Amino acid sequence: MLSEGYLSGLEYWNDIHWSCASYNEQVAGEKEEETNSVATLSYSSVDETQVRSLYVSCKSSGKFISSVHSRESQHSRSQRVTVLQTNPNPVFESPNLAAVEICRDASRETYLVPSSCKSICKNYNDLQIAGGQVMAINSVTTDFPSESSFEYGPLLKSSEIPLPMEDSISTQPSDFPQKPIQRYSSYWRITSIKEKSSLQMQNPISNAVLNEYLEQKVVELYKQYIMDTVFHDSSPTQILASELIMTSVDQISLQVSREKNLETSKARDIVFSRLLQLMSTEITEISTPSLHISQYSNVNP
């Protein structure tokens, strides 16, 4: 539409240009005719009044034609302007589309749950999954046990899983003989992998059995961690072997040897013995050693 308006504007501009050019040519022609008529009047014997009347009539007829042409061009221009005003934004107009209502299917799929989940259907009666209503399974049309077998017990009690699901897993407990529990980490890691595989193959267990098993494993893990920390990782020899503590021991030994006028080796043995006493398990209370270190202790007043 914009290109059509631009082309129509070019056509209108060309009309005005040609009309003005024709009018100028007509005026120039009239001037030439006037000069020619004056020249001919001076040399002809035609009556002057007749020539002038003819000239006036021709001039008036030319002006009338030009005025009519200009009025027609103005009228066509006003029509184009009114068309553009009535349709100000024609590019972005589009036919009105009918609103399409998205209707839901009347026969929506109903998600059925076992009768053991009846508390969900009771407490959350408006629960929907993917647009489908959640309802209890009818025991007549399915192979699940009757509702009376799920009368008591929590919702997620694993011992109440229906029998057909239990029969699908068949293993012999004798395949995994129980071994005495030992108290070191390597055996704990190995047995945990074996027990994990055995738990996956055995029958479903209840929450109580599962919680007891997890508590037992956590206690074993903490005991093993404490034993490793006390007897291996945090032993006095390993603590004293660290670079930071040994540097501090050397500084303390030098200070003690200077203050007490002792050899460096003896002062170091004293510091080691004191640290071993502090880190021994027999002492439950740490006392501050009575060491008076001062550089002015041997100075006489």
From Swiss-Prot:
Domain of life: Eukaryota
Stimuli inducing this protein: Escape from X chromosome inactivation results in an increased expression in females. In monocytes and B cells, induced by type I and type II interferons as well as LPS.
Record bears the keyword Phosphoprotein: yes
Motif pLxIS motif, residue range(s) on this chain: 290-294
A GO CC term attached to the entry: intracellular membrane-bounded organelle
UniProt PTM: The phosphorylated pLxIS motif constitutes an IRF5-binding motif, leading to recruitment of the transcription factor IRF5 to induce type-I interferons and other cytokines.
Keyword Membrane: yes
Tissue occurrence: Highly expressed in immune cell types such as B-cells, neutrophils, dendritic cells and monocytes, the expression levels are two-three-fold higher in female cells compared to male cells (at protein level). Expressed at low levels in T-cells and NK cells.
Keywords: Cytoplasm, Endosome, Immunity, Innate immunity, Lysosome, Membrane, Nucleus, Phosphoprotein
Modified-residue entries (Phosphoserine), positions: S294
One biological process term in Gene Ontology: positive regulation of innate immune response
Localization annotation: Lysosome membrane; Endosome membrane; Nucleus; Cytoplasm
Disease with which this protein is associated in UniProt: Some alleles may be associated with systemic lupus erythematosus (SLE); a chronic, relapsing, inflammatory, and often febrile multisystemic disorder of connective tissue, characterized principally by involvement of the skin, joints, kidneys and serosal membranes. It is of unknown etiology, but is thought to represent a failure of the regulatory mechanisms of the autoimmune system. Because it evades X-chromosome inactivation, its expression is increased in female immune cells which may be involved to SLE striking sex imbalance towards females.
Domain commentary: The pLxIS motif constitutes an IRF5-binding motif: following phosphorylation, the phosphorylated pLxIS motif of TASL recruits IRF5.
Quaternary structure and interacting proteins, as annotated: Interacts (via pLxIS motif) with IRF5; leading to IRF5 activation. Interacts with SLC15A4; leading to its recruitment to endolysosome.
PANTHER family: RCG36411, TLR ADAPTER INTERACTING WITH SLC15A4 ON THE LYSOSOME
Entry protein name: TLR adapter interacting with SLC15A4 on the lysosome
